[in-house]
């Protein structure tokens, strides 16, 4: 996973700490996690960051903006008000389901909205 020749097509880092966000933006590759992110960026593969630790500071948002401009998908673990989740498991399933959607992985973790 830490080499472009390994052939990873999609990478998700979730949860992604603010420290990891800053390191990814700065190009650090000093750990396996940072190296996997660096490889995804250099190979122009899909990279999704489930950034946590809100509220976000201006500096955090600038890191997210720059990474987004580089093609990274910023997908914080935030529950949508329309999800109608009534317990913690449903909330978790909604967030995980949204990440799986971004990865192109089918699932049935939450009920999809139906346009009647």
Predicted features along the sequence, with ranges:
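A cross-family phosphate/adenosyl-ligand binding-site feature
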Residues: 1-48, 53-116
């Amino acid at each position: 996973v830490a080499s472009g020749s390994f052939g990873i097509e999609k990478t998700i880092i979730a949860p992604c700490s603010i420290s990891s966000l800053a390191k990814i933006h700065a190009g650090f590759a000093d750990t396996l996690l940072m190296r996997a992110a660096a490889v995804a960026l250099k190979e122009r593969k899909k990279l999704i960051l489930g950034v946590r630790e809100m509220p976000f500071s201006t500096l955090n948002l600038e890191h997210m903006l720059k990474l987004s401009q580089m093609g990274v998908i910023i997908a914080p673990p935030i529950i949508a008000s329309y999800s109608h989740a009534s317990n913690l498991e449903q909330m978790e399933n909604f967030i995980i389901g949204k990440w799986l959607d971004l990865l192109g992985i089918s699932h049935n973790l939450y009920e999809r909205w139906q346009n009647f």
